[in-house]
Amino acid sequence: MVLVLINGRPLSINWADKFVPAILEAWYPGSQGGTAIAEALFGDYNPGGKLTVTFPKTVGQIPFNFPAKPASQVDGGQTPGVKGNQSRINGPLYPFGYGLSYTTFEYSNLQLSSPVITDKEPVTVTCKIKNTGTRSGDEVVQLYTRDVVSSVTTYEKNLRGFERVHLEPGETKEVSFQLLPRDFQLLNKDNHWVVEPGMFQIMIGASSEDIRLKKGLEIRAYGQASANEIIESDPRDFISASKNKSISSMWLTETIPLPGKVKKGNTYPSNWQRTPK
């Protein structure tokens, strides 16, 4: 038995998920929808689509959108913010980006053009995808980012790119994405779009919850200088740090004077001021 859905929005289909062996999401397929559905059901066409919405397990979870910010609805066995929507009660029935195929795919060899960039530079992300099944098919490779620490609440994950790749059985291809500075921006408390220095997670997945590969990326402020250039042994010296700047990977939530005992070799943005001159 196969359930074919013809609908225009997410549905609550827990019973079908539990008792029906297969579900085909057709949405509103148009005048040739019958032919397309038949080709998919009989195997003449290998589906490769992914959900652009989240299907909830219960209507009590609505609104249940992607991207989502950390929620207070926490499953006792989960840590808030660690697994995205899985941190909510029960999690989704089908997450954003989910979709099956008549074949299987393997993800490997995630690479960044650089592990450290400035807030003015792009970064190239590459990975390899292999068709490990017996049929040719398409996989939609999805790129997500996560801001590890930020001055304001941000989304748990952001979709920053996707690529549909056709692969024959046993074939491997390399997929490449480019992340620009604007892909790391957030709207701060002053309603300004900024890139805050710090650590980000770069994630490659088959859906928003099925993350196959991940790497850390550090972003530093443009023109960041070495503390060797200004730190002296005089304890009267200090650096006046403006809000949300970092030193030694620690985030400062207020304007804080840092004593002159800061160790040599630490870094700070070039627009910080040293007093006395």
Feature map (PLM): residue ranges:
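Compositionally biased low-complexity segments at domain edges in trafficked proteins
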Residues: 229-272
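Intrinsically disordered, low-complexity Pro/Gly/Ser/Thr-rich segments with frequent PxxP/GP/PP motifs
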Residues: 151-187
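Terminal connector regions
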Residues: 180-227
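Hydrophobic anchor at the start of a short beta-strand
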Residues: 1-2
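Secreted, periplasmic, or luminal enzymes acting at the cell surface/secretory milieu
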Residues: 6-138, 144, 164, 169, ...
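Short coil/turn motifs at secondary-structure junctions
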Residues: 132-134, 148-150, 182-184, 209
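Intrinsic-disorder/low-complexity, polar/charged segments enriched in Ser/Thr/Lys/Arg/Asp/Glu/Gln
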Residues: 122-124, 172-176, 212-214
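Short acidic, flexible loop segments centered on an aromatic residue
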Residues: 134-151, 157-159
